Design a protein with these regions (language model features):
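Residue patterns forming the tRNA-binding/recognition surfaces of aminoacyl-tRNA synthetases
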Residues: 3, 12, 16-20, 95-253, ...
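Conserved oxyanion/phosphate-binding beta-strand-loop segments in alpha/beta enzyme cores
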Residues: 1-40, 70-79, 102-110, 214, ...
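Alpha-helical recognition segments enriched in aromatics with Gly/Pro capping
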Residues: 311-334, 482-619
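Helix-rich, typically C-terminal accessory recognition domains appended to large enzymatic cores
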Residues: 148-160, 164, 228, 415-444, ...
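Amphipathic alpha-helical
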Residues: 14, 199, 204-228, 264-307, ...
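Catalytic alpha/beta core of large soluble enzyme barrels
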Residues: 62-63, 75, 267-367, 372-373, ...
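N-terminal catalytic cores of NTP/NDP-binding nucleotidyl/phosphoryl-transfer enzymes
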Residues: 28-100, 104, 127-142, 249-250, ...
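Basic, alpha-helical terminal appendages of large translation-related enzymes
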Residues: 1-20, 25-34, 264, 279, ...
Length: 807
């Protein structure tokens, strides 16, 4: 093989893998695997446009990890599927005038072709397609199991409604008041919806964060989204009525600074407390607030609006009367839907009070002397209580305890823990999704469909465009809607909402090893063998939706005896994002990179290698058109080296370089620092070929094995050329470094400060200037002189001297 033809090599080995079933598991293979390792990556939504280079980046990085684990001797199960239901597919089908039942199969076929072409080791024997009745039958089963567990509830609630998509959209899908799918302004509606009670698991989900090996930014996002708050429920008696307004606050220490109350527009007391003089104004304001989406109402920088409802309540500590207002900056979903407004110490309350000329009172000061004067902004720092009567001089923490104790003694407060997390609304008034398996009966109410009657098939509708009724298009298929009640046999009507696509993806990983059976959703033996998932790689953007929902479903199934583990993914890593020539890649910028063209020109291995060379996998990198030539040249030189290889043994210097490379590559690949892995392999090849020397097979075999996760086709070809008959991935061939040979030579160099020798440090040939300075600062004698002034200049000659100029 004097020349390297990617097209020929890749076609040959993809065909060979298919013929031999190299990447496939039979049911027996799954059952008998000795070292099972489940390597999962997020399954894609199969768009009509196909995969773009960002997708290829993500899937290649995950495949590199899976192939590495296989070379370490694991039986790596790496399935792939398609998240094909949902509003994206439906909207595109409406746009092009094609039924989604016809559109999705061709999209999946194209995605499969692209995924095969990049050479990933997917097990195509175990795929899932969320639109397949054999899959969504079990999604409906998941719903029923959660229903049996008391974790499903139908209730009326304010929701974000997109008038263009004509369906409910989650808070997370509203960006700056616009629907993320179509950019239409979102409004608020009160609609009966099906909810999954994820809030029952809020604390469990928080506690579990401590025990899973996930990307820190993903765990932080989940922690913030769940949003645990410790505080108190406090009752404010309503003047002239024998009832109270209950508020939840995390700052009971500031109660003496509460100068007015605010109710959310949806709060039932708004209507009950509004007097006749204010009713017309209040009702108009409430209607206006309903037209706003829930997420936009949370923006801190929104102008504050509201109106007094004509009522007062009493501050339970000071006895002062406080006017009761209604404003859209208070949300019914958080706390009790009512707040005690403390404008002196809350920025939103301060802005509201300033807008409507309401009193602002300081009750927290940095020290006891700083308790007077006009407040020009809210003070949100720590300090001592002031202007708080008997509580003056207490710290914030002491004030919280003392005030709650006094209120509790008078039955006006109770300590509480609340969460930002809301229950998960799964109802969608669209066509393209799994029908929710519920039947309504006038006598029996909402009745779950018996498991034996699953799946509730989604009928083919030729007219599936949603309308303004708020009902799903399925409601127009009266024949489908009409059915018998499973309990009494009387007339029944099917639920016409379909479920959120995030329910499809909340459990798909559980199904992968069980696709060989249609009798049950989860094969107990297979689930015990292969789950929880060992490694999961995907996008950080799914931190608070898919990943949180998957954890919830898994915990619920564990609690009800379906699973014997409570966390679905032992390890999760969020991959980085690519840019192009320094600019974000997007359709609007016209700089989307199509992988098919790249692979046709350069070959899949070169594309894989280049993408992984762009930067640490968890950070991403910048795609440069000219950058791909370097990886291409490297593969060509390696192929040429194999063609010219001798049977002799390597010399001692090359042997040491080999083991240092094995050591570095093994360490860096564990940290997903794929770019430095590739750099190390390139450097090693330079050492092996230095001065035009002929490489030995012994010197080349380790580099080929370590390259195999990145360039699997060429690695297989070169392995065969070196005389091996089996696949490079069959026998756990990952090399181990000899600690003695991998030792890096160290030597002492002098450290001069302002031209005078002040000490020495121990370095290697690879020690960087920054590392050398760190070592110098750790030397007490040197550090004394470095700290005497400001470092103005550093002159570092690797292996010789470190010279520092200090002012």
């Amino acid at each position: 093989m004097d020349t390297y033809s990617p097209t020929e090599v890749e076609a040959k080995w993809q065909s060979r893998w298919d013929e031999l079933g190299t990447n496939l598991f039979s049911r027996d293979d799954l059952a008998t695997a000795e070292k099972p390792y489940f390597n999962l990556m997020m399954f894609p939504y199969p768009s009509a446009e196909g995969l773009h280079v960002g997708n290829i980046y993500a899937y290649t990085g995950a495949d590199v990890w899976g192939r590495y684990q296989r070379l370490k001797g694991h039986d790596v199960f790496q399935p792939m599927g398609f998240d094909a239901f949902g509003i994206h597919s439906e909207n595109y089908a409406l746009k092009v005038g094609v039924n989604p039942n016809d559109l999705i199969p061709s999209n999946i076929s194209n995605f499969t072709r692209q995924l095969r072409r990049i050479g990933a080791m997917f097990d195509w024997n175990h795929t899932v397609d969320t639109t397949d009745p054999n899959y969504y039958r079990w999604t409906q089963w998941v719903f029923l199991k959660l229903f049996e567990a008391g974790l499903v509830e139908k209730r009326e609630a304010p929701v974000n409604w997109c008038p263009s998509c004509k369906t409910v959209v989650a808070n997370e899908q509203v960006i700056q008041g616009l629907c993320e799918r179509c950019d239409s302004a979102v409004e608020q509606r009160q609609i009966e919806q099906w909810f999954l009670k994820i809030t029952n698991y809020a604390q469990r989900l928080l506690d579990g964060i401590e025990n899973i090996d996930w990307s820190s930014r993903t765990l932080t996002a989940q922690n913030n989204w769940i949003g645990r708050s410790e505080g108190a429920d406090i009752d404010f008696p309503i003047v002239g009525r024998d009832e109270s307004i209950r508020v939840f606050t995390t700052r009971p220490d500031t109660i003496c600074g509460a100068t007015y109350m605010v109710l959310a527009p949806e709060h039932p007391l708004v209507d009950a407390l509004t007097n006749d003089e204010q009713r017309e104004t209040v009702e108009a304001y409430v209607e206006q607030a309903k037209r706003l989406d829930l997420k936009a109402r949370q923006y801190v920088d929104r102008p504050k609006t509201g109106t007094w409802i004509g009522a007062y309540c009493e501050n339970p500590i000071t006895g002062a009367q406080m006017p009761v207002w209604v404003s859209d900056y208070v949300l019914i979903e958080y706390g009790t839907g009512a707040i005690m407004a403390v404008p002196g110490h809350d920025e939103r309350d301060f802005e509201f009070a300033s807008t409507f000329d309401l009193p602002i009172k300081r009750v927290i000061a940095r020290d006891s002397s700083n308790n007077a004067g006009l407040m020009t902004e809210a003070y949100v720092g720590d300090g001592l209580l002031v202007n708080s009567g008997e509580f003056d001089g207490l710290s914030v923490a002491e004030g919280k305890r003392a005030i709650v104790q006094k209120l509790e003694a008078n039955s006006l407060a109770t300590g509480q823990v609340r969460y930002r997390l809301h229950d998960w609304c799964i109802s969608r008034q669209r066509y393209w999704g799994p029908p929710i398996p519920i039947i309504y009966c006038d006598d029996c109410g909402a009745v779950p469909v018996p498991e034996a009657d699953l799946p509730v098939l989604l009928p083919r509708l030729e007219q599936f465009k949603p309308d303004d009724s708020g009902d799903s298009p399925l409601a127009r298929d009266t024949e489908w809607c009409s059915t018998a009640c499973p309990e009494c046999g009387g007339a029944g009507t099917r639920e016409t909402d379909v479920s959120d696509t995030f329910l499809d993806s909340a459990w798909y990983f559980l199904r992968y090893p069980c696709t060989d059976t249609d009798e049950v959703a989860l094969d107990v033996d297979m689930v015990k063998k292969w789950l929880p998932v060992n490694s999961y790689i995907g996008g950080h953007e799914h931190a608070v939706l898919h990943l949180l929902y998957a954890r919830f479903v898994t915990m619920a199934f564990h609690d009800h005896g379906i699973l014997d583990f409570a966390e679905p993914f032992e390890k999760f890593r969020a991959h980085g994002i690519l840019s192009k020539e320094g600019r974000k890649i997007s359709k609007s910028r016209g700089n989307v990179i199509i992988p098919d063209d790249l692979i046709s020109e350069w070959g899949a291995d070169t594309v894989r290698l280049y993408l992984m060379f762009l930067g640490p996998f968890e950070q991403g990198g910048d795609y440069q058109e000219s950058g791909i030539r370097g990886p291409s040249s490297f593969l060509e030189r390696l192929a040429l080296s194999v063609a010219e290889a001798s049977d002799g043994k390597g010399d001692e210097q090359v042997l040491q370089a080999m083991h240092r490379t094995i050591d570095k590559v093994s360490n860096d690949i564990e940290q997903l620092k794929y770019n430095t892995v590739i750099s190390a392999l390139m450097e090693y090849l330079n050492v092996v070929r230095e001065g035009g020397r002929t490489c030995s097979k012994q010197e080349l075999e380790p580099i080929i094995v370590m390259l195999a996760p990145f360039a699997p086709h060429l690695a297989e070809e070169l392995w065969e050329r070196l005389g091996h008959n089996s696949s490079i991935f069959e026998s756990g061939l990952w090399p181990e470094a000899d600690p003695e040979l991998a030792k890096v030579e160290t030597f002492e160099i002098g450290v001069q400060v302002n031209g005078k020798l002040r000490g020495s440090i121990s370095v290697t040939a690879d020690t960087s200037e920054d590392d050398a300075m760190t070592l110098a600062r750790s030397n007490e004698r040197v550090a004394t002189h470095l700290d005497a002034g400001e470092v103005r200049k550093v002159i570092y000659v690797p292996g010789r001297i470190l010279n520092v100029v200090v002012n």
